[in-house]
């Protein structure tokens, strides 16, 4: 496992995530470049919403991607950056997918990205994907989403 430590510096088995608003575009690659990262799991504990996984990959540290100056200056666990726009090209993002699933994201923040999977949350399912894949929540949260995530390394 390769999960963040607790506030008491103990190993954790993963993270419970309760979201009332969509989680924006990011990657969960960690911060230790000596590790060989592997997979991330998502266990839905509610049935509301989707997670959008992109084909695009990022090999830097855990990063939240944005073009919003306020978001770029925000402090948090992840680094903040707009460098993805220089990596994946300027191809316009699919307007229908944006409208149906990603209304919380500025469509210009999604330039050059290509969807691999739109995973509909279902109790009892387990989503497993590479930690280098960019991903985010859909904007389809009725009240809240609750899930459990883990990260692995080799």
Predicted regions and their residues:
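Catalytic core of non-heme Fe(II) oxygenases with the double-stranded beta-helix
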Residues: 18-133, 138-154
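A short coil-to-beta-strand element that immediately follows conserved catalytic motifs
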Residues: 2-15
């Amino acid at each position: 496992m390769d999960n963040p430590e607790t506030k008491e510096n103990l190993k954790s088995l993963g993270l419970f995530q309760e979201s009332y608003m969509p989680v924006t575009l990011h990657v969960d690659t960690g911060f230790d470049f000596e590790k060989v990262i592997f997979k991330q799991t998502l266990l839905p504990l509610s049935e509301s919403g989707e997670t959008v996984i992109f084909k695009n990959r990022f090999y830097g540290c855990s990063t939240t991607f944005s073009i919003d100056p306020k978001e770029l200056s925000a402090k948090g666990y992840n680094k903040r950056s707009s460098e993805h726009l220089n990596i994946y090209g300027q191809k316009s993002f699919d307007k229908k997918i944006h409208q149906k699933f990603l209304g919380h994201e500025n469509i210009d923040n999604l330039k050059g990205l290509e969807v691999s999977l739109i995973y509909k949350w279902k109790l009892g399912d387990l989503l497993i994907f590479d930690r280098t894949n960019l991903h985010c929540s859909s904007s389809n949260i009725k009240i809240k989403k609750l899930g459990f995530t883990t990260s692995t390394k080799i």
